[in-house]
Amino acid sequence: MSGYSSDRDRGRDRGFGAPRFGGSRAGPLSGKKFGNPGEKLVKKKWNLDELPKFEKNFYQEHPDLARRTAQEVETYRRSKEITVRGHNCPKPVLNFYEANFPANVMDVIARQNFTEPTAIQAQGWPVALSGLDMVGVAQTGSGKTLSYLLPAIVHINHQPFLERGDGPICLVLAPTRELAQQVQQVAAEYCRACRLKSTCIYGGAPKGPQIRDLERGVEICIATPGRLIDFLECGKTNLRRTTYLVLDEADRMLDMGFEPQIRKIVDQIRPDRQTLMWSATWPKEVRQLAEDFLKDYIHINIGALELSANHNILQIVDVCHDVEKDEKLIRLMEEIMSEKENKTIVFVETKRRCDELTRKMRRDGWPAMGIHGDKSQQERDWVLNEFKHGKAPILIATDVASRGLDVEDVKFVINYDYPNSSEDYIHRIGRTARSTKTGTAYTFFTPNNIKQVSDLISVLREANQAINPKLLQLVEDRGSGRSRGRGGMKDDRRDRYSAGKRGGFNTFRDRENYDRGYSSLLKRDFGAKTQNGVYSAANYTNGSFGSNFVSAGIQTSFRTGNPTGTYQNGYDSTQQYGSNVPNMHNGMNQQAYAYPATAAAPMIGYPMPTGYSQ
């Protein structure tokens, strides 16, 4: 097939001459850990006339694409909910061969059994291959990574070979270590096929191997802002050769406070570069960043122009009090874990809550592990590996894992604590229903979250989801000022919470109160509510989950044609977990968790690697 040829195909030798374009060979790493990151970096004063010229437009429109009429293009864009803004935007490619990627790239695509480009790939590839700046706004799991990596490979193949002292040609900035590593995993397979080198640099890991990769020369560098600035300041790499810049999850990087570091980094890159910015949302802060960094860019939006969730996700909201969450979570897990393939992520608000909930669930026999920002990189990698391979199918996480965590077969997301914004809510639930799969998201929504209720209802309505009548009641109560008074759902037990906690396993369901029979009290209360119709199949007006949620279990059909229709209870499982779980071992060399058909003897402690808190 036709592809992109370049002088790289002629096998030029990679010499070891003097550093080009101002490459640095500075001394050892600085030991300074505090202060203003990037304060040693001086903003470059670029003279484009003195810089080597480079190519960035390599797009060859396929004959099949050229014959496609404007009406056919518009029909395709409407069917895929593609909205384009900007001048001279190329037509979308409907098939992989229309992108004219090199044969070795097409071979990898064939091995991965992809059938057709996703919407963002179909429209993004022609734009990126044309050398244009672009902004891509699409939901999580939509194929954004390949949208910029494959054009990056074509771009690199048309540039001169790296020489000693040269920095990367393609720089991908990512907000978290996990996302950077996942991008590197995707890049590695394509780079091997194309005889290119890539590396991933991030904090929390030894600097030595990362420095050696940079010194040997890499065409693609995937980096978190902090570690990259560290290496730039001490001269271990430079960005003089960088002509293809990617800002992945730009909204998340701004949320995490990386804007000053991003600006310091971009100041080190020549201004005539090609820049691609990717985001799941389009707030004003991201718009401002695009105006500052991009020139005459094409804006591609997939899905609704406003804040929207993946329509393949069934969203179920339970309006409750904080002290009710633990019992509700256990009942949910009893139903979910009746199928061993049901990987589940439970999102919590704080690191402390993450540790507490993980310890309690493990003591009760659940195969759960926790991940948050205070974990070491080695421990985070180990936990994610256990989760991905099904050895610990329950992951309890803070928002550190809500973006960029790419595990294909996550079936359920549970928002134990509602996040601070609807954007974070959308990113959290986006961990399920990756690509074209479906998934389910449960959310515990309390009166403490009332400021978010209107935004949540908007997200649910946009996705054609059933809306819990209690959410609508909260809106009315908020408007009348009753949400904290007698007329609303005031939590009259807030004074019992310890400092920094709102419910959780360290309030009513701590070990002492649990042994005294509080669990039985809650179960009796739940049974009474069921008999009185609160959780009944016939009437959801005062209930918890689902719309027309057929009582054959969570995996059954859910019809959202009537957003205010009858709710039916999906908790028909009578299997009891808690301490009645068979012996289970976990570890790198142990077999996966065996899911019993019947209850068995109490389990022994769930073994962890050295240094992991029980």
UniProtKB/Swiss-Prot annotation:
It is found in: Nucleus; Nucleus, Nucleolus; Nucleus speckle; Cytoplasm. The modification Phosphoserine is found at S24, S480, S520. Belongs to the DEAD box helicase family. DDX5/DBP2 subfamily. There is a cross-link at K32, K45, K53, K340, K343, K388, K391, K411, K437, K451, K470, K523 (Glycyl lysine isopeptide (Lys-Gly) (interchain with G-Cter in SUMO2)). Involved in the alternative regulation of pre-mRNA splicing; its RNA helicase activity is necessary for increasing tau exon 10 inclusion and occurs in a RBM4-dependent manner. Binds to the tau pre-mRNA in the stem-loop region downstream of exon 10. The rate of ATP hydrolysis is highly stimulated by single-stranded RNA. Involved in transcriptional regulation; the function is independent of the RNA helicase activity. Transcriptional coactivator for androgen receptor AR but probably not ESR1. Residues 477-614 are annotated as: Transactivation domain. A motif (Q motif) lies at residues 94-122. Residues 1-39, 477-504 are annotated as: Disordered. Changing R403L: Binds to the tau stem-loop-containing RNA. Inhibits tau exon 10 inclusion and RNA cleavage. Does not inhibit interaction with RBM4. ATP binds at F114, T115, E116, Q121, A138, Q139, T140, G141, S142, G143, K144, T145. It catalyses: ATP + H2O = ADP + phosphate + H(+). The modification N6-acetyllysine is found at K32, K33, K40, K236. It is an enzyme of class 3 (hydrolase). Residues 1-15, 488-498 have a biased composition (Basic and acidic residues). GO terms for cellular component: catalytic step 2 spliceosome; cytoplasm; cytosol; extracellular exosome; membrane; nuclear speck; nucleolus; nucleoplasm. This is Probable ATP-dependent RNA helicase DDX5. Identified in the spliceosome C complex. Component of a ribonucleoprotein complex containing mRNAs and RNA-binding proteins including DDX5, HNRNPH2 and SRSF1 as well as splicing regulator ARVCF. Interacts with RBM4; the interaction occurs in an RNA-independent manner. Interacts with AGO1 and AGO2. Interacts with ESR1, AR, EP300, CREBBP, POLR2A, TP53, RUNX2 and HDAC1. Self-associates. Interacts with DDX17. Interacts with BRDT. The large PER complex involved in the repression of transcriptional termination is composed of at least PER2, CDK9, DDX5, DHX9, NCBP1 and POLR2A (active). There is a cross-link at K53 (Glycyl lysine isopeptide (Lys-Gly) (interchain with G-Cter in SUMO)). Its EC number is 3.6.4.13. GO terms for molecular function: ATP binding; ATP hydrolysis activity; calcium-dependent protein binding; calmodulin binding; enzyme binding; MH2 domain binding; mRNA 3'-UTR binding; mRNA binding. The lineage of its organism: Eukaryota, Metazoa, Chordata, Craniata, Vertebrata. Arg-502 is dimethylated, probably to asymmetric dimethylarginine. Sumoylated; sumoylation, promoted by PIAS1, promotes interaction with HDAC1 and transcriptional repression activity. Sumoylation also significantly increases stability, and reduces polyubiquitination. A motif (DEAD box) lies at residues 248-251. One of its GO terms (biological process) is rhythmic process. It comes from Homo sapiens (Human).
